[in-house]
Amino acid sequence: MAHIELKNITKKFGGHTALTGLNLNIPDGEFFVLLGETGAGKTTTLRMIAGLEKPTEGQVFIDGVDVADWSAAERDVALVLQQYSLYPRYTVRQNLEFPLRPKIRRLPDAEIKDRVARAARTLRIEHLLDRKTDRLSGGEMQRVSIGRAIVRKPRVFLMDEPLSALDAKLREALRTELKNLQMQLGATFLFVTHDQIEAMSMGDKVGVLNHGRIVQTGTPQEIYNNPRDTYVASFVGSPPMNLQEATVDDGKIVFSGGQSLPLPGRFKAKVNAGDKVVFGLRPDDLYPVGHGLHSGDAADVHEIELPVTVTEPLGNETLVFAEFDRRDWVSRMLNPRPLRAGDRVAMSFDLSQAHLFSAETGKSLRA
């Protein structure tokens, strides 16, 4: 187990800057998820911690020691990749043993046997030990790949989108298994992904990375409920937050089509008349009347009638897309009732749950 800290990391590849002034602190034993779109710098960050890349500027600390000049082997970290990195001609047992053999670790045979048995038992792959890996399913191969990391007993587990090549059902199962494994081992995990469902369901903490910068870190609940800017609001959450540009005028939020809403009191000290803002509301906080519960003050509850553009039935709920100010707003409707495109539906929402962002900077104005 280990404490990881990155200080003011900048990484350049020729004229391209992959990371800019990145700071990251991962306590010992934490499951930390780095979430970002393709090209955000997630894998570059992982490779610098692993010792496969050196920062252009800044420092990498493991347990308080600057390891910038240490090789990957000296850092004692384990890397699990999207591609399984297994030897197809070897059995599962031989693949698990390989990192421990004389040329690598020089462990006694008894110790190797014990570590392999423990890893196989933990990952429930004991029945596969004598099978060659080219005869395994994708999920089984990924378990073996994780097992190769476990047998080493590394200080840190680094995981680069290990579930992205699996089908949806298997990804869901392995999300739970990986989280349980991390708690069982008590190890430090850094898991990178572009999938916000993986991030929110697995991480003790999540860091959102955008164009080489960490824009927000916090628990999944903190990031979902209090996004720091419009990027986080639109990226985290499925469906994402409804965002609509507006102008502040005479104590109201006025939209371009002429509709207006009262400006919530907590924002009044943060904006002036004429300010351009972005109004935000989660689909969970926008209900067809009679299909949701509002926990706030009744004075904050408002209703608007909107035309339905499309619906997405999901069984126990339906996503309703309805046009507001020339954009589709999304509502999550529980206890679904039949709705069709063109229907007009009364929508209810609680302004105490609304978000407001600066249109100029994208930063949250929420208290």
Question: Model-derived features: where do they sit?
Answer:
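Conserved coupling/switch loops of ABC nucleotide-binding domains, chiefly the family-specific signature
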Residues: 56-59, 211, 354
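Conserved ABC transporter NBD signature motif
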Residues: 58-66
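The feature captures the beta-strand-to-loop junction immediately N-terminal to the Walker
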Residues: 35-37
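Helix-to-loop junction immediately C-terminal to a conserved catalytic motif
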Residues: 50
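ABC ATPase nucleotide-binding domains
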Residues: 76-78, 82, 86-231
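Glycine/charge-rich catalytic "coupling/switch" loops of P-loop NTPases
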Residues: 252, 257-309, 338-367
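ABC ATPase nucleotide-binding domain
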Residues: 5, 25, 61, 346-348
